[in-house]
Amino acid sequence: MNRATPRRRRWRIGELAEATGVTVRTLHHYEHTGLLAATERTEGGHRMYDRESGQRVHQIRALRELGFSLVEIRKAMEGTTSLTDLLRKHLERIEVQVARTTLLRDRLRNMTIDSEAQVSVDELPATLNAMSRAETRSQTSRCTCNLAAEREDRWRRIRDDLRDCMDGGEHPCGERAKAVAVAARLLISEIAGDDSRVSMILKVLARLSAPRSLAGWDPCLMQYLDLALGGLEDQPY
């Protein structure tokens, strides 16, 4: 008498998500992009997965941690692209990012370590621009020298207009101060995008400036700008 072959273990999508450490939504996305397919479906239409499905999810996660896109992962897993070639190209991208990040680190170190150095808040646009380049994987356009100079001029005008508001007793949330804050927010957004660290950078530079004034920016003016920007939080860009 032949013994029945035991049925292989099957997992529902929620069970697979828990076993592999991802969300159900992520598994649905993997299916949508062709990276994962259900082994079978129940009569009720529920997706079922097997052991190989779990292994595939772990492989996808490993490649994602290396920084590969889902498109690249699919090509590698389907064999249409050599994984070695993908790794080599990705290494080249990482080396470029490391070089950019190292340059940014050196700039920030020069601005903060040397206690005798004059840290100019007017350099903020250039600093944020460098940060944006260092963190962006694909840079489609670069700021020319003329554009950088134009932005620095705008930043100085913002400083002067803000100083006039503060010296004139204008409340940080007053109409004139708001108009200047809108211009400041727009300029910062052009350079850094939706980066939550902008406020942090402003506060750090304000602390570094005490007790001296840096290119016309002092802690009081920095705080005034911070309050004016805070008054715009509920307003759209």
Curated annotation (Swiss-Prot):
The keyword Cell cycle does not apply. Residues 13-32 bind DNA. Pfam families: MerR_1. Keywords: DNA-binding, Nitrogen fixation, Nodulation. GO terms for molecular function: DNA binding; DNA-binding transcription factor activity. Residues 10-79 form the HTH merR-type domain. One of its GO terms (biological process) is nitrogen fixation. Induction: By the isoflavone genistein. Involved in genotype-specific nodulation of soybeans. This is Nodulation protein NolA.
